[in-house]
Amino acid sequence: MMSNEKRGEAIDLSHHLSKVGQARQTSPLKSLHKYMGKPGLISLAGGLPNAGYFPFASVSGEILAPDSFPLETGSKDSSLSWFWKLFSRSEKERTSTFTVGKYPKHPGDLNLESGLQYGLATGQPKLNEIIREFVGKVFQPAYSNWTTLVHTGNTDAWSKTVQTILNPGEGLIVSEWTYPSAMASAQPFGVIPVPIGMDSEGMSSISLQKTLAEWDESVRGFPRPRVMYTVPIGQNPTGTTMGIQRKKEIYDICVEYDIIIVEDDPYYFLQQGEYVPKADRVTDAANGDDEVFIASLAPSYLKVDYQGRVIRLDTFSKTVCPGSRLGWFTCNPMFAERLERTAETSSQAPSGFTQLYVASLLLKWQYDGYIRWLKALRLQYKQRRDYFLDCFGEEFHLQKAFSTEGYTAGAHLYYASLKPKRSFVPLSEKDTAYSKPLFSYIAPTSGMFVWLELHLEEHPSFTSLGYKALEMKLWTEIAEAGVLFAPGAMFFATKVEDDTPGPGHFRVSFSNSSPKEMKKAVSTFGTVLRKFMHTRI
């Protein structure tokens, strides 16, 4: 790892600020905070409620031990025993307690007097120290003057970023399949999505280069885009993982065309690796020291960002809890200062309670404890993914084939056809509705989702209805049977019209259901498919 002394500073990228981003000024009242720490100061300037009237004398909580979840799953025969224990809650949880008092016992202690008071958008100093240490050790930015800034979760962080660096009528580079809430957030600001082709690592550097090199403003109607939005790990919805070589390729293209990369990475620590079918699986283990664990993760764009053109969005939503609404930016100081100005007159600092609770958790665990938690968390979600995909293998007949085209190129595809159940319909050897694949997927390598591509060409009403109508009809019947999938059309970067060509898709989550529910959901899906494929609409 190169020392900061040998690394250059971020280049001047202020020309990427939007008109709104340029116009923001320091909140007049917030500008007074620079005097607040002066010894002996009597402040009569701000409308700060008296901390003596806060109705909380202290706050406290119980924290799970960082090693509450195992780093290995045991023998092959009992590989799910820990999984069932997770839902039975038969074993007493090991916890420790923390308490935050109203006033600090020692200088720098967490306390309610300052933690629950109005403050700067930069948040609690102690939490900032923890975050900065974590980023330096884990993400290792490639320039010296990087900084961090807390925010209220990646959704709001992205909204602030859009306002800060994008103007109405400008383009935004995105993957052809992308996170719909990010697009919904940008759309009211008049931002135009520019879809880029994908393969099994996510955004294709070849497609990106081609799109930018061939850009014709007179045809497109707006200038070549200068901002990219990407979810490189656990790509939402496809579940792919982008490696360091692809990131270097894309980063170099962004340097060539002067593009800012917004790296939205909530699933970073849920990198599960390749799926191994149940019959071939051996004991899972996450042993190894902290550096081995960190080295096993696909690096962030920060690792190759020597110019400060990456704005990274991190969140505690997937590693602690989503209700915390807490995360942080990592970016160059110029962007951080502009984002701070945006927060001053909107969300301000994240919730004081949230900051105190999360800071207390991380102080209790320390860096080593948090890394231990993350190691086990990755294994937990890996086992969930494996079990869910195993259920597909039990319910459907699967054929594995290497894909060379489209967003699955470079990965093995699983083609699923129905296993006949004579209790539903008569079956002949030539029944194509059973013998041909009805959907396919690549096993996700990160995140929480499986992305199913539907193959409904053998449906008796396909010629008259087409892909989209059949997709939504099938989705409705699955929902009415008690299982809810996310319709694929909402994840397309641009609006899907009735005549948009191409197969339908479903995004299916394995993150929050019990093993029994997962198995039932896949079985229900199979039952609905059997009936659906033999029903003319």
Question: Which sequence ranges carry the predicted segments?
Answer:
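Short beta-strand segments
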Residues: S43-G46, P195, Y229-P232, V262-D265, ...
